[in-house]
Amino acid sequence: LGTEGKGFYACMEGFNVARVVVAAACLGGAEKCIEIAADYAKQRKAFGRPLSKFQGISFDLADLYTQLDLLKLQLARGAWMIDKYYSEPGSFTQKQINPIIAQCKWLAPQLAVESAKRAIMICGAFGYTKDSPLEMAMRGAMSYVAGAEGAANIMKIIISRDIFGNEFVDK
């Protein structure tokens, strides 16, 4: 199973892979919420115009879309680093990988929640009914914010250690 006394470290390595999966799931959920809201905004009319023509709607989705794109890039970077870590030993250390993955795990669930929330607002009353996939998206995203594979504050500790060093960050 591994070297005696090193089980904790082996377990912690596994968290990075799991956090990539969690972040990817959240980004997929966020993307779907943005798509649903955009489709609805193109079809639904107010004052004779599609909702998408109102900047309050289009700018919200532009913000979410931009954050989604940036997080996809960061997640791809982190996944690539993990792949290299296992396929080319010595290419990266866990110390180099940890903060990248923590950033993704911290921000992706928040983006998924925010995307679901804004999509629900754009879709109005339909958005939070059981007939809408958005209410389920919100519940699913919240489970990742609350703690699956490490709560947001744990991710911030990992990132803080990268900034300040272990000796300057409380555990």
Question: Residue spans of the language-model regions?
Answer:
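Alpha-helical interface subdomain recognition
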Residues: 2-6, 10-171
